[in-house]
Every structure is written in C-alpha cells, then in structure tokens.
Amino acid sequence: MLRIPVRKALVGLSKSPKGCVRTTATAASNLIEVFVDGQSVMVEPGTTVLQACEKVGMQIPRFCYHERLSVAGNCRMCLVEIEKAPKVVAACAMPVMKGWNILTNSEKSKKAREGVMEFLLANHPLDCPICDQGGECDLQDQSMMFGNDRSRFLEGKRAVEDKNIGPLVKTIMTRCIQCTRCIRFASEIAGVDDLGTTGRGNDMQVGTYIEKMFMSELSGNIIDICPVGALTSKPYAFTARPWETRKTESIDVMDAVGSNIVVSTRTGEVMRILPRMHEDINEEWISDKTRFAYDGLKRQRLTEPMVRNEKGLLTYTSWEDALSRVAGMLQSFQGKDVAAIAGGLVDAEALVALKDLLNRVDSDTLCTEEVFPTAGAGTDLRSNYLLNTTIAGVEEADVVLLVGTNPRFEAPLFNARIRKSWLHNDLKVALIGSPVDLTYTYDHLGDSPKILQDIASGSHPFSQVLKEAKKPMVVLGSSALQRNDGAAILAAVSSIAQKIRMTSGVTGDWKVMNILHRIASQVAALDLGYKPGVEAIRKNPPKVLFLLGADGGCITRQDLPKDCFIIYQGHHGDVGAPIADVILPGAAYTEKSATYVNTEGRAQQTKVAVTPPGLAREDWKIIRALSEIAGMTLPYDTLDQVRNRLEEVSPNLVRYDDIEGANYFQQANELSKLVNQQLLADPLVPPQLTIKDFYMTDSISRASQTMAKCVKAVTEGAQAVEEPSIC
C-alpha cells in the first residue's frame, strides 16, 4: 500500500508532457485497437485489460479491484490469458498494448480462476447460512460461476480474532480475504489511516493494530465495498435477508447535500439504508448519519394528535378536535398576530401549503430557523445562497477558500469531493476559521473574520494565490451567517468573489461564490420567500405560532407572550413538541413523497417507503385539512396539484435533478456595498468541530440509539487518549 505522498508523486510523474511519452497510438485518433475474445475495441492508451473487457460488456471476476480506489492487484481473481503471452496476467493492473487479443474464457483463464478461488476458499469458513452478506456476496456469486466443484484442502482452517472498531461496523475477520478494499477506502476516500495489515502470508490480518474505534464519518461505506462478510452492519445484524426486503429509491435529508439512497423495508419497517449512485452528488458513498440513524424513525414518534388540557398536560385527542382548536385560533387572529417557523426537515410541499394558509389570514411572517442575512442582496438573488459551483464542480477547481465551515461534518460527501480533488488534481485549500481536521492539508489563514477584509483589499498574501488561480472557489459555511455580523461576512465574501472574477483568469461560466448549507429545507424555504431567522417573531411576538417541524430550539416559551397559542406539527417529540398547545403528528422523509432542494439548488424527491405510524399524516395534507375546517380552503387536493402550485411560485422546485444557473454575482456585489455592518473580532467557530458533534444534529438522529452509541464510543475513546493507563 503506497502512502499518500508517494502516490501523489507518482500521479505527478504520470502527467509528463506527451512529447516525453512513447505511445503506440496513432496521431489521428490517439486510440489503440485491442481484441477481446476476437471482438475489436478502440481504447485510450493506459486503459487496463479489465476496463477494455468491460467496454465490450465482458465481465471479469474481481475482488480487490474497485473503480474508485487505487489498483492493488492482490486477489488475482481477474487473471486472463493474452494470446501468445507465456503467462496469464492480472486484468485490473495490466495496461493494454496495441493488437493484444485478450482471451477471457480460454481454458488457461478458467484454470487460473479456479486455482485462485480454491486458495481463497481454503481458509474461508462455511458461515453462509448465518452471514449477513448472504444473498449479496461477491464470493458466493463468483465461486458459483468461476470456482471448482470441490476442494482439495484437508488441513484445518485458520481462525482470526474479531476486531472491535466501533458500534457501527461488525467484524468477522475469519471471513476476510485480504482484498484491502477497506484499507484503501479509509486511506484514499475517508482520509483516515486507522486500518492496515499486520503479518504476512497465512498470518496476514486486517485491523487497527491496537484496538480502537474506526474514527470516520464515512466508515459505513467499508460495509458496501467489502466483497465478503468480513465487514457487516452491527445495527442490521441478523434482522433481514436482502431478498426479503422491498427497496425504495429516495434521498437523504440529514444534511443539505441530498445524497441519493435506497431504503430497504420489510413489514412496514425501515431495515437499513444504502447508498444509490449519483455521480454529481454522492457518487456511491453516504455518511454514517445517513446510513445508521434510521432507528430514530421508530423512537419518540408522534403518532396521535394531542392538546393541552386545563391542567397544562398534553393529552391524546382526535384529529377533528385538534384541527378544530387550531382552526378556531386562526379564525380569531389575523395578520401579524399569526406567524410560522419552518424546521430543517420540512419538504417543499408543506412549505408552500403553510405559506398559502398564512397568506389567507393576511400574514407573511413565515420564518426559517436558520438565519441568512437579508441586508444587501440578501435572499433576493438566488445565486447569493447557493453552492453555485456545484458539488461535482469542486473537482475542476484549483484553489478553494473555506470560510467559517467544517465541511467534514457539515457536508461529509462534499468534503470527500474536496479530498478527491486534493489527492488527484493538486487542489490548494485554505481555511479561515477554527483549525479542524479536514482529512487533507490546508493553509490556515487564521480564525478572525477580519482576514476577509485583507483578502478583499489585496493586502493579504493569499490574495495573490486567488488572483493567479484559473478556477477558484470561495465556500462560505451557513453556520458563519448565524453570527451577529453575518451580513458583513457575506458582503466581504461577495466582494472577494467579484474581485477574483475581475482580476484573475476566471471564465464567464465559472462561479466563485458558494454557500454551503447545513439543513435540508433551507434552500426550498428561501426559494418560496420565507424570511430567514426568527428575529421578526422576537420583535413582534404573535398570538398564534405555528411550528412546522421546528426543533432547533431557536425560540422558547420565554420568548413569547404567556397567552401565545403554539401549534407544533412534526414527526418527533423533540424540542418543539413540549412547548406546544396542540400537536399534529406528521410524516418523516421515508413516509412521504416529497420535494427537497439541496445546497446547490437541485430539486429531488423522496419516495414513500413505509406508511406513517399511527394516525400521523403527510404535512401538506394536514395543512390542507386545517384550511378547510378554518373556512379558507386551499385550492389543491392531490400531490400533483400541490406541485403545480410549487411550479407557480418557484418553477425550479419541480425541475427534478436539474440545476438552474444563477449569474447575478455583479449585482449581488453592488448591493453588498450597501451593508452597514462591521466585522466582529470574535473567531469563526463552526458548531461541529469534532466527530462527536456530527452524530446528533436533528430530531431523527437525536432519537437514534445507534447515534447515541457513537457519541458514547467517541467520548470514551477521547478520554482513553487523554488519560492513558498507568500500566
């Protein structure tokens, strides 16, 4: 296994000028012709035998090879014969040469695979009936297709002690075939060197050397890439077989990236969550919170409507009674006496329905929990609050300036993209804010926001780096905008971005200014005209307050008049429900077909995987029923009609998996000059500094026992490091 600096040096060597490289390609096409089982195929120079075979649809068996990891070539399962070559070659590691005829199904190739498979199975235990990998195991499939029908191994099989690497990944290391996929993933994708090998030959083992937790926010992905049952999910252990589950394609709402997922369910219960391929967002990875927090969907759920009685206690009631009480209050108060706050997990359909309902009572006090400055361009220009370069676009950047953010825990898949570009494209990264572990090296410019002024004026040394960059990115974390000087920070970043565009070699299509959001609902709420932050409610306390999934604790009972009537609509009894006078149980993201917009402005849909528990209903349906009882019926009855209304208000919300370019950067910069606010000297400190802060950030993950175990394991691990044993 090559260390990262060595690998980066080798990558640099591979980028030699073409004049210094001897090639067999023709000058006209730069492609070379090879043959796969007699079938001609044209490929790029440097293409491996395995890639050439896949190009014509020929599948080569493999265990260690993975297209997103470096080539190890140590399982030897991909051995194929090259015509006139003395020996078989490893298809994953051997570059093709002009005129080669690759024989994938020759007797020599088959014999080689059978021999490799026999060696792999010699020490492999017969655990298939009790192995969680059963039914989706590469070793099972390939031994059936390419292996022999009997073994000649008569000696005793070896046994390996299992490793404890945390509460998420279960290890049965006797099943390990030493493909090193997990080691390469940890080192290359996750940026953590916790995993490695010890011993050699028959005594070789994969582990952490000393017993410790695999400290990564992406650790669950080693379960997916493990070709055997050596690494499986601890929470999922012995619960279901893959052929028993129903799979629903959906998206994740634990952060603002919008990772694509597959929800596996059985008998109306979420059994597990797996990643779904999307090259422009999450590739084929997901974060541990996305993967393992699903048990929070079953705990602390609101399943029936509740009202507060004369004694001040919340008691169960019927939908008719609960909606009638709320309708009565909406009929009694109008205008500024009615307000609403939308939480971080709310879908666009519910947001537009609530907006229409409050507009019927002449109120426009619709707020989000997350603050975004309204001074200057504010939220009037969409480019002002999006990740304009896009998530995949970071792979084209040559310089990234991070401001007040820790993307490793606020947006793990975006951070993985930055690491990927840093590793393969020599990306230069700089950070303004508290020093954090980002899994890649960066220049720490300091933690004071006043550094932004120095960069904007050109007096800071990093100004020259940005000026010389061809595709620079400035990424401002939304957490930095929660400060009292958020408007000044946004104006300073906007000024830097515009000056870079004017003075460097940035082309017209490249976008410099980027906002990295943390919560799933924020972009859709801003698109629909919600006011960011609850300052308007604090200044003018309402008589009726509607909390739509608002569990961030941005407002408390003490902030409101004693006679304020609070309605909470959501799916968990978390922060908002205990202060409410009426509770309306809603549906979680796995229980409804809903629209969410990620930080880059891409609209995506969740799908119904299970039905809501008890009497809970979809949020927009509750609001629609409430409007009818209150005598102000909203003009839609079906989901399609709600989405037609979404299209009227903001057409981009129904253009799924599409990103609309936003280019009003110059106008935003001109308006930012009108901001009359000074930068504070307080350091920029992101709320999620360590992995302990990553696991429990919303109502679902806070209800998850698995996430609580992670916090406990990380805390105990940190204490063990701080307080070493006397022995």
From Swiss-Prot:
Kindly give the Pfam families that the UniProt entry links to this protein.
Fer2_4, Fer4_NDSU1, Fer4_Nqo3, Molybdopterin, NADH-G_4Fe-4S_3, NADH_dhqG_C
Question: For [4Fe-4S] cluster 2, which residues are the binding ones?
Answer: 176, 179, 182, 226
Q: Which UniProt keywords apply?
A: 2Fe-2S, 4Fe-4S, Acetylation, Disease variant, Electron transport, Iron, Iron-sulfur, Membrane, Metal-binding, Mitochondrion, Mitochondrion inner membrane, NAD, Oxidoreductase, Primary mitochondrial disease, Respiratory chain, Transit peptide, Translocase, Transport, Ubiquinone
SMART domains linked to this entry: NADH-G_4Fe-4S_3 (SM00929)
Q: How does it sit in the membrane?
A: Peripheral membrane protein
Q: Where in the cell is it found?
A: Mitochondrion inner membrane
Question: Which family is this protein grouped under?
Answer: Belongs to the complex I 75 kDa subunit family.
The entry's protein name is NADH-ubiquinone oxidoreductase 75 kDa subunit, mitochondrial
Which gene is the coding source of this polypeptide chain? NDUFS1
